[in-house]
C-alpha cells in the first residue's frame, strides 16, 4: 500500500469516526430533551401533590405558579 493510499484511508477513518460521534451525541441530546418534557408533563399531572410539598416546590417552581 502506498503512502498516499494509507493517508486516504486514515482520512476516511477520521471522517467516519467524526460523523458517528456527532450523530450519537445529537441522538443523546434529543432523547434527553424528550425525557425532560415527559418528566414535566408527569409533574404537572401531580401538581397539587408537588406544590404542597416544600422540597418538590423548590425543585420545580415552574409548575407551582
Swiss-Prot record:
Contains 2 disulfide bonds. Keywords: Acetylcholine receptor inhibiting toxin, Disulfide bond, Gamma-carboxyglutamic acid, Hydroxylation, Neurotoxin, Postsynaptic neurotoxin, Secreted, Signal, Toxin. The modification 4-hydroxyproline is found at residues 54, 61. This is Alpha-conotoxine-like Am1.5. Residues 22-46 form a propeptide. InterPro entries: Conotoxin_a-typ, Conotoxin_a-typ_CS. PROSITE patterns: ALPHA_CONOTOXIN. The keyword Heme does not apply. GO terms for cellular component: extracellular region; host cell postsynaptic membrane. Residues 1-21 form the signal peptide. The cysteine framework is I (CC-C-C). Alpha4/7 pattern. It holds the Pfam family Toxin_8. Expressed by the venom duct. It comes from Conus amadis.
